[in-house]
Amino acid sequence: MTPRYELAAPAERDLEDIFFEVKERHGLLVAERVYDNLLRTFDLLAQMPEMGRHRPELWPPPYRFWGTGPAFIAYRADVRPIRIVRIARASHNWSGFAPRG
């Protein structure tokens, strides 16, 4: 079976960082909930890749963005499987993130 989405290496690190940051601040159960919510959101984006918005003020197309809870997901919907390139807290300054992937 072909995967529905893939995580770029920076997104894998982001996901891990978010998990451990939430665990440290709010405990394991909350961290697991946030992690599971992100994985469900990746699946949803794979089912409806056009759901996210282009945000040219952040990154040029083909990158799209989708917010879920405290996180903001940058991904490419123009490739299959879709490619999750970065994940950050919604309040994060995206200008420091270079779109790789």
Predicted segment positions?
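Basic, Lys/Arg-enriched alpha-helical interface segments
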Residues: M1-W59
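Conserved strand-loop elements at the edges of beta-sheets that form or border functional pockets
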Residues: A9, G67-T68
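Short, P/G- and charge-enriched loop/turn segments at secondary-structure junctions
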Residues: P60-R64
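Enriched for short, Lys/Arg-rich terminal
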Residues: T68-G101
